[in-house]
Design a protein with these regions (language model features):
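Hydrophobic residues in alpha-helical segments
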Residues: 22, 98, 102, 122, ...
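Mobile beta-alpha loop/short-helix "lid" or hinge segments that flank ligand
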Residues: 57-63, 156-159, 173-174
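Conserved amphipathic alpha-helical segments that form helical-bundle/coiled-coil interaction surfaces
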Residues: 83, 105-166, 177-185, 194-204
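Short helix-capping and inter-helix turn/linker motifs at the boundaries of alpha-helical repeat units
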Residues: 9, 106-109, 171-174
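Short linear motifs at protein or domain termini
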Residues: 1-100, 207, 211-219
Length: 219
């Protein structure tokens, strides 16, 4: 766990550092979060860590249990299912708008570049890099859609999508990036309705994979 770099508001940097560790699952769901240990790892005092944990609790990332302390939130199947369903709606609309955009040119090149990067990460079994490339890929399509309200809504759920995607990234692997390449072709052709259909199927695959993995772990 790297120590924080200066400058910037300390409480904000501690919050972001802990949130990134949770999102990438460096801190696992259900893991006990000890203030003194986190403070030592980040090279700060316990006060900003305590404030960050309280904020993370408010935002639903951390559970504060009386007489026990702080724990990384363990998402229920229903929570994950609901959020990933909303993600499907947002991303399908974004894919449609991106395909209907007047000149997707530069965006298509960027999407292809991200596909190359994601496929290389899969070959290298670099899960964190694959997850990051996946997030950038979907964010780029959202940007190409050109709808600020849609982008704002997607940003609100984006970090949790990464949280849920990380444990299935290796399993989705090559298939996910193959679906990305098919989607790029349809967007480049300007077929918005087919792009929406393909994105809907793509995100549903991820949702089902996550649900199946959770159920297998609970069995």
């Amino acid at each position: 766990m790297p120590k924080l770099e200066r400058p910037g508001p300390l409480r904000e940097r501690v919050y972001e550092a802990l949130l990134e560790l949770i999102t990438t699952r460096a801190l696992q769901p259900g893991q006990h979060l000890v203030e003194s240990e986190l403070a030592g790892h980040l090279g700060v005092s316990r006060q900003p860590v305590r404030e960050a944990l309280q904020r993370l609790n408010t935002d639903g990332w951390v559970d504060l249990r009386p007489a026990q302390g702080a724990f990384v939130h363990e998402p229920t199947e229903a929570e994950a299912d609901q959020l990933l369903s909303v993600r499907t709606l947002l991303e399908a609309e974004a894919a449609k708008l991106a395909a209907f955009s007047i000149d997707p040119g530069d965006g298509i090149e960027k999407l292809l570049e991200l596909c190359d990067r994601g496929e290389q990460a899969v070959r290298d079994d670099a899960v964190d890099l694959a997850v990051a490339a996946n997030a950038e890929f979907h964010a780029k399509i959202m940007e190409m859609a050109g709808n600020a309200v849609l982008a704002e809504l997607a940003e609100q759920v984006g970090r949790r999508v990464r949280w849920y995607y990380t444990p299935v990234a290796r399993q989705r692997g090559k298939q996910s990036w193959a679906e990305h390449r098919e989607l790029i072709e349809v967007i480049a052709e300007g077929d918005g309705y087919r792009a929406a259909e393909m994105m809907r199927a793509h995100t549903e695959h991820t949702r089902r994979t996550y649900r199946e993995q959770v159920r297998a772990q609970d069995a």
